[in-house]
A protein has these predicted regions:
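Short amphipathic alpha-helical interaction elements located at domain edges
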Residues: 2-145
């Protein structure tokens, strides 16, 4: 039996994101990397709920903190093994129907901005993996302008 996230779990994620948003970059990256690695190892349904909670929690940050936090999240995900990274991408794709449309669009925009900071080869690899993740999830790939 998979334990899905409760309201309390979502609040814990929200509190963690708020706290980390003000942390020094090195500490933020370390903590976010540990968290996404842990989430990548969760059972599928729980992983989707964890990713959803993280995306929603980040969306609640003030605008000055969102972009840097998304950059940190992408850096953490890029540091995972290919299997863990794909698990996170598939979970993000599967979370799309459960996210408010404005939150999903904003998150997608920040992901694209963050990925553009990487060399072209890494950008292409990320986008190829993301396309595969959406195909695996059976969810239409959003516009990535």
């Amino acid at each position: 039996m998979v334990k899905l996230l409760t309201f309390k779990d979502s609040l814990i994620m929200e509190d963690m994101i708020k706290m980390l948003a003000d942390a020094p970059e090195e500490q933020k990256l370390q903590m976010v990397t540990e968290r996404v690695k842990m989430i990548a190892g969760q059972p599928d349904d729980q992983r989707v709920q964890s990713v959803k909670s993280m995306v929603i929690a980040i969306s609640k940050l003030d605008s000055k903190k969102k972009s840097p936090f998304h950059g940190t999240r992408i850096k953490a995900i890029m540091s995972l093994s290919p299997e863990e990274r794909m698990a996170m991408m598939v979970a993000r794709a599967r979370a799309v129907p459960e996210l408010p449309e404005d939150v999903d669009k904003e998150d997608t925009m920040y992901v694209v901005q963050s990925v553009k900071e990487y060399p072209e080869e890494k950008q292409k690899a990320f986008m190829t993996a993301l396309t595969k993740a959406f195909d695996t999830a059976g969810i239409p790939m959003p516009e990535m302008a």
